[in-house]
Swiss-Prot record:
Pfam families: TMEM215 (PF15746). The keyword Transmembrane helix applies. Residues 125-140 have a biased composition (Polar residues). It is a multi-pass membrane protein. It comes from the Eukaryota. The keyword NADP does not apply. It comes from Homo sapiens (Human). GO terms for biological process: negative regulation of retinal cell programmed cell death; sprouting angiogenesis. It is found in: Membrane. Its main location: membrane. This is Transmembrane protein 215.
Length: 235
């Protein structure tokens, strides 16, 4: 690239069409004075010679010396069938609409079966991730009723799913308002007072406790509105 930011190929195009530009300009000026070439006025010949040269220079600058396709020009050409790129079949499967997911056509079980991952638990890392159960304790509402985030059927299904990926002993499961840890694990579990102060009502808490870690512990709270139990979600 030249210091003046002009492609050498563009400069070559300008040099080649400069002859047409000069003669086109001369014929245009002469035609404005009323001169003719036989029965043909020069005012009609000048622009016919000059305009193709200007178009060639503009095209050379857009394509950087005819080396690449214009970025934002001739968009209608890209819409032709010959320019369309076929989408990957796996990408189309993953980009299903929410209606297909709700109908079960693109469920997580189906995708896992296609990927060959069904029944194979993921490798456990050194820092085990503790998944806390939802708060099942009654939460009084304005009407004086009690509500729970997860129904019994969904909760049992979720528990079986978590047991398959997190075997017993590899994770700590507890309620945010009730400590259910044994004596040996009590040092790793937070106190009920801390959870009551920070955990929103009727929410899900996902905490990570890694032994001998300089980052201590951290928790992630999921709002009730954002919770979706119809499909698995990896946090």
């Amino acid at each position: 690239m030249r210091p003046d930011d002009i492609n050498p190929r563009t400069g070559l195009v300008v040099a080649l069409v400069s002859v047409f530009l000069v003669f086109g300009f001369m014929f245009t000026v002469s035609g404005m004075k009323g001169e003719t070439l036989g029965n043909i006025p020069l005012l009609a010949i000048g622009p016919a010679i000059c305009l193709p040269g200007i178009a060639a220079i503009a095209l050379a600058r857009k394509t950087e010396g005819c080396t690449k396709w214009p970025e934002n020009e001739l968009l209608w050409v890209r819409k032709l069938p010959c320019f369309r790129k076929p989408k990957d079949k796996e990408v189309v499967e993953l980009l299903r609409t929410p209606s297909d997911l709700e109908s079960g056509k693109g469920s997580s079980d189906e995708l896992a079966k296609k990927a060959g991952l069904r029944g194979k638990p993921p490798p456990q890392s050194q820092g085990e991730v503790s998944v806390a159960s939802s708060i099942n304790s009654p939460t009084p509402t304005e009407e004086g009723e009690c509500q729970s985030l997860v129904q019994n059927g969904h909760q049992e299904e979720t528990s079986r799913y978590l047991d398959g990926y997190c075997p017993s002993g590899s994770s700590l499961t507890y309620s945010a308002l009730d400590v259910k840890c044994s004596a040996r694990d009590r040092s790793e579990c937070p106190e009920p007072e801390d959870s009551i102060f920070f955990v929103p009502q009727d929410s899900i808490i996902v905490c990570s406790y890694k032994q001998n870690s300089p980052y201590d512990r951290y928790c992630c709270y999921i709002n009730q509105i954002q919770g979706r139990w119809d499909h698995e979600t990896i946090v």
